[in-house]
Amino acid sequence: MHEESSQLSKATGLSPYDSLISKYDIDYDSTKIDEVFSVIEKDIIPKYLEIKKISSPYVYKSNISDPKLLDCVKKKLEQLKFDFNRGRIDQSHHPFCGGATNDVRITTRFEDNILESLSALFHETGHGVYEQNRPIQYLYEPLGQSRSLSVHESQSLFFENHIFKSKVYFKTINNIFGNSKDLEKSFLDHYHTVRINPIRVSADEFSYPIHVYIRYKIEKEIFENQIKFDDIKNLWNKNYLDYLSINLTSDTEGILQDIHWYEGIFGYFPTYALGAMIASQIKYNCPLFGIFLENPDAENISNLIVWLNTNIHQKASLYSSDEMLQTISGEVLNSKYYLDHLVDRFVK
């Protein structure tokens, strides 16, 4: 990877690490990322250490059969403007979204923790709706491509975090389960409570950016030649203890938990947190989001998604990420919106 980053750096004129980041996000380099990620170290980490809980969340187990649940979920996805004439949803061992604009394939799995299954499904649907609404006339040209992984992730996280995990929308989900008090308790435990968890993909929304920040800092040190290979594990463990108050006892729950570095994927991790920040900035500046929160009926949900289609999905690569945010919010990427969202959901 050092050789690849060196050659890319020579070709692009970027620093070795920035040349890797640019494979996944052409708009934000490490200087900008340092700027917006400062909110993680200055604000999110101290608040996390103050409000974190050690206990595990309550898990609700559904007694609805998988086929029946899948049928109910499909109706929800139709409300979210996922076009089943140009896509489909199936069950698999792991959730993902793939295919092309006119043939989007989403998969999910229904497991004991039904909330995690539904959360993953809404996440993948966000990716799918973005893909289905890229401009057809420019589909095979650079202009018609999705802007970046950060923007793509912002849409999946908008569907997952700002729609599915909102308390008002959850009530419409709980209707499927007979307005279960147990499911409501599980929902609040999972998505409105901050907990210690060593695994990134299982972390709550508040602590998740800290997991990303740890990886970003280590990657940056690797490609700036500030750390030796043999010291990476110790730095990882130290950061988990300092930032997350987690004393790691195994590499399975530590440095070996992700597939990215095995596959030679460096510079990817920042896009997860950048996507969350973009999604939050969109949320606070979308004129229809407040209407959705007041009444998440089919019409208001449809209007909200059409707004996303018009202002983000159909713009594809016409604008840079900051230009897109300028048109929506009047300013470039600003991490204060992300902090506001986390405080509103987990602290207030």
Placement of each model-derived feature along the sequence:
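All-alpha helical catalytic cores of prenyl diphosphate-utilizing isoprenoid enzymes
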Residues: F37, E41, D66-D90, T125, ...
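Active-site metal-coordination segments of metallo-dependent hydrolases
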Residues: P142-E153, S207, F266-T271
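Post-HExxH zinc-binding segment in Zn-dependent metallohydrolases
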Residues: Q145-L183
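Inter-helical turn/loop segments and adjacent helix faces that build the functional surface
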Residues: D27, K47-V59, P135-P142, I163-N174, ...
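C-terminal, non-catalytic "cap/extension" segments appended to globular domains
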Residues: Y216-K348
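Active-site recognition of the HExxH zinc-binding catalytic motif
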Residues: F110-P135, E153-L157
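Alpha-helix capping and helix-loop boundary segments enriched in small/acidic/polar residues
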Residues: I64, D112-E116, L143-S150, E205
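Contiguous, non-catalytic segments that form substrate-binding/exosite surfaces or channel walls
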Residues: M1-L115, Y319, E331
